[in-house]
Amino acid sequence: MNKIFFFKILLFAYLASFLRFFLNNNLLVGVIGSFVYGFVISRRVSKLKKEILLTGFCSCFTSFSGFVLFLYEISIQGYFLKLFFYLNIIIVLNLIIMYAGFLLGRKVT
């Protein structure tokens, strides 16, 4: 891995962290990240560009640990029904949004 490629991943991770700081909503962040992920994987871009966008930006932006912390906080408050619904809604919604991003990416040339 060359230094410029590594720097680009770090730059996109920094940008994602900056955006994540201002968007403190796990559902919104997950939806945006899933859409971007679906869009990028549908495009014919180089493997390096995909790694920069998906590893650098999407992975840092969506941060699975933020999602898990959100679910943990609901569970320790004893809201297990709410936990069940949030868990399922977030997963299903993100799959649908990722598929929509994929379809849109295929249509855009």
UniProtKB/Swiss-Prot annotation:
It catalyses: fluoride(in) = fluoride(out). The keyword Transmembrane helix applies. Keywords: Cell inner membrane, Cell membrane, Ion channel, Ion transport, Membrane, Transmembrane, Transmembrane helix, Transport. One of its GO terms (cellular component) is plasma membrane. InterPro entries: FluC (IPR003691). The chain crosses the membrane at residues 21-41, 52-72, 83-103. Pfam families: CRCB (PF02537). This is Fluoride-specific ion channel FluC. It comes from Prochlorococcus marinus (strain MIT 9515). The gene is fluC.
